[in-house]
Amino acid sequence: ISEHWMSLAGIFNSHLMLAMVVEKFGTEAQKDYWLPRFASGEMRGGLALTEPDAGTDLQGIRTTAQRDGDDYVVTGTKTWISNGIEGSVFATLVKTDPQADPPRRGMSMMILPKHDPETGAPHPGFRTGKRLEKLGYKGIDSAELIFDGLRLDAARHLVGGAEGEGFYMAVGGLELGRINVAARGVGVARRSLYEAAAYARERKTFGKPIGEHQAIQLKLGEMATRVRAAELLVEDAARIYDRGERSDQAAGMAKYFASEAAMENAA
């Protein structure tokens, strides 16, 4: 997909991370309720982690979910959330115990929909903020999500049914995200190679296609090598992830190399 439209793969990635959280960590009842809606496209969304004052420092988030009987009341703001405008549901990292030490022990993951999946009625307390403009990568929207006393029942919306596990769920989602970003890098690098090779056959100098000049052949060879190496790193990371093993190192290596390959081949 990324060979033709990288932003579209980004839309899928955010939705896949949402689905992964429920598939991997949700209760059986949550899986039965949410996953068919995610798979059919009835609902799509993403992973809401980042806040105005907490990016890479996930333990610094301020969005809270306070228990009130059988419900939670969510208050806070998320920002730079992919699919924030067009999406309708988000796996959202919150603090259920703001006083926990270390902070990660007080963090939980909740499924927060903009509207009731059954009636379609908007949820009071969930508001989409402004669309955030980017320099590029405009095919996927980014936005603020604002929670102002959003009330939802615990059984359906607290992932896994237990507090304090959200940090580990978020990290698991990021592993999948890194592999997806790496795959996107492969797509861009591969398309760059195809376009370069096609141009090398078409453009002529000194009476022959430039692809017959050794200097161009060396450049194309380097591009092809980067593509193949990136493919292997992505496949390795994906296999490790699919086996249920820890894949953060392999995913990080694949993301780094494939994104560099995309930049170098495109340049």
Spans of features found by a protein language model:
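Flexible, small-/acidic-enriched active-site or ligand-binding loops
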Residues: 118-149
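Helix-loop "lid/cap" segments that line or gate small-molecule binding pockets
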Residues: 16-25
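A short core secondary-structure module
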Residues: 73-127
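Alpha-helical interface subdomain recognition
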Residues: 1-2, 9, 25-30, 37, ...
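Active-site nucleophile and cofactor-binding loops and adjacent substrate-binding regions
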Residues: 8-15
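Active-site-adjacent elements of ketosynthase-type condensing enzymes
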Residues: 53-61, 122
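A short, Trp-centered hydrophobic/proline-enriched beta-strand micro-motif
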Residues: 41-49, 93
